[in-house]
């Protein structure tokens, strides 16, 4: 938890999930402050759009202007809602949209936190292109190291004339004026053939490893369980390739695809629809913070390729929460399978949570682990 006085209001903000007290991470950064310094209450007229507000620092500061918070992270929405409540600001002050929704027309101000992936930024800029006007003030911010020539060129290509500021506290801003430059259409998804199958895998803009199968998933797919029954979870499903393979290998089972990214869940649904439409009645698709709100003792197996970063920060907090949720929601003798980089040492973390852990396979970079829920002990 950290305090910030940004010129609009004094706030106490925390990350979601919360980090430990030993290695605390802030819920705001210099780029948030820098963006807010550019604004004056009197100049905000028309809809205010805020894109990729990771923990709600901008939305909370500007809540009196009833901003739209737009992004591809359910965790960010939960963080913003929690920080609004914590600062006694009505949750209804902020309207939440995911990146696939239509944006409000003719915004007066657009604030963008530059996302990690250029593909998501392009998708969002193309969506903005449909609604902004030459009078819309468009400002983007990020750590200086995360603003590249390619970032500026993308703003120029999609929206119009673009300039950048000097660095301040290692943050920089991008100012852009809409001039509607000529722009070729772009496909909504990027697609590729999955080796060894006749499947075409479709990927929306913010899906991890959207240009091809990542090497961790490739290794995991070589060691997926077969002959499972009941409900299986593809937790952190991404484009759904693991869940799709589970559907094929386990015809007696159903698969729940879960991710905090609406684009990931949309990609998973699309990939089942196009590659195994006959299996749709064995599928459920869920945008969620891991397995929050899901009843305990429900699933026979959970499979997970957990992230070890949140936005630009390295952290195992998301993975740790996934493991705890998996244990709670597994039936007795239910199994958790994960693939992870070897250096993360998840073996001992799983053993601490489940009381057991087995190495299924390993190579020079990755390890596949299995933990079994043996009883009600934590």
UniProtKB/Swiss-Prot annotation:
Cross-referenced InterPro entries: DNA_methylase_N6_adenine_CS (IPR002052), rRNA_m2G-MeTrfase_RlmG (IPR017237), RsmC/RlmG (IPR046977), SAM-dependent_MTases_sf (IPR029063), Small_mtfrase_dom (IPR007848)
Coiled coil: none
Reactions that this protein is recorded to catalyse: guanosine(1835) in 23S rRNA + S-adenosyl-L-methionine = N(2)-methylguanosine(1835) in 23S rRNA + S-adenosyl-L-homocysteine + H(+)
Pfam families given in the database record: MTS
Molecular function via GO: 23S rRNA (guanine(1835)-N(2))-methyltransferase activity; nucleic acid binding
Listed GO CC annotations: cytoplasm
Subcellular location: Cytoplasm
Alphabetic keyword roster: Cytoplasm, Methyltransferase, rRNA processing, S-adenosyl-L-methionine, Transferase
SUPFAM superfamilies xref list: S-adenosyl-L-methionine-dependent methyltransferases
Superkingdom of origin organism: Bacteria
The enzyme's E.C. designation: 2.1.1.174
PANTHER family the UniProt entry points to: RIBOSOMAL RNA LARGE SUBUNIT METHYLTRANSFERASE G, RIBOSOMAL RNA SMALL SUBUNIT METHYLTRANSFERASE C
Function noted in UniProt: Specifically methylates the guanine in position 1835 (m2G1835) of 23S rRNA.
Protein name stated in the entry: Ribosomal RNA large subunit methyltransferase G
Source organism of this protein record: Citrobacter koseri (strain ATCC BAA-895 / CDC 4225-83 / SGSC4696)
């Amino acid at each position: 938890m950290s305090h910030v006085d940004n010129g609009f209001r004094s706030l106490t903000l925390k990350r979601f999930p919360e980090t430990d007290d030993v290695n605390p991470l802030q819920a705001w950064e210099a780029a948030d402050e820098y963006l807010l310094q550019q604004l004056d209450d009197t100049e905000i007229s028309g809809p205010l759009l805020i894109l990729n507000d990771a923990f709600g620092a901008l939305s909370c500061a500007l809540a009196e202007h009833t901003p739209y918070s737009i992004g591809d992270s359910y965790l960010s929405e939960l963080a913003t809602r929690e920080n609004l409540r914590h600062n006694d600001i009505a949750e209804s002050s902020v309207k939440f949209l995911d990146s696939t929704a239509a944006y409000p027309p003719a915004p007066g101000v657009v604030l963008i936190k530059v996302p990690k992936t250029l593909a998501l930024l392009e998708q969002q800029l193309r969506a903005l292109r449909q609604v902004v006007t030459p009078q819309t003030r468009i400002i983007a911010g990020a750590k200086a190291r995360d603003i590249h020539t390619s970032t500026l060129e993308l703003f120029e290509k999609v929206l119009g004339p673009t300039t950048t500021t000097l660095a301040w506290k290692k943050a920089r801003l991008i100012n852009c004026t809409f001039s509607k430059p000529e722009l070729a259409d772009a496909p909504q998804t990027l697609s590729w053939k999955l080796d060894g199958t006749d499947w075409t895998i479709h990927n929306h803009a913010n899906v991890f490893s959207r240009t091809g199968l990542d090497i961790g998933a490739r290794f995991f797919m070589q060691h997926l369980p077969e002959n499972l029954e009941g409900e299986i979870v593809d937790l952190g499903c991404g484009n759904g390739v693991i869940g799709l393979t589970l559907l094929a290998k386990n015809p007696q089972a159903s698969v729940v695809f879960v991710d905090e990214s609406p684009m990931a869940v949309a990609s998973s649904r699309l990939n089942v629809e196009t590659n195994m439409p006959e299996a749709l009645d064995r599928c459920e698709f869920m945008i969620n913070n891991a397995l929050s709100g899901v009843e305990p003792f429900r699933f026979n197996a959970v499979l997970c390729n957990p992230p070890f970063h949140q936005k630009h920060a390295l952290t195992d907090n998301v993975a740790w929460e996934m493991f705890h949720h998996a244990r709670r929601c597994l039936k007795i003798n239910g199994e958790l399978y994960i693939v992870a980089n070897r250096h993360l040492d998840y073996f001992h973390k799983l053993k601490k949570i489940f009381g057991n852990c087995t190495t299924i396979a390993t190579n020079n970079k990755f390890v596949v682990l299995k933990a079994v829920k043996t009883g009600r002990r934590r």
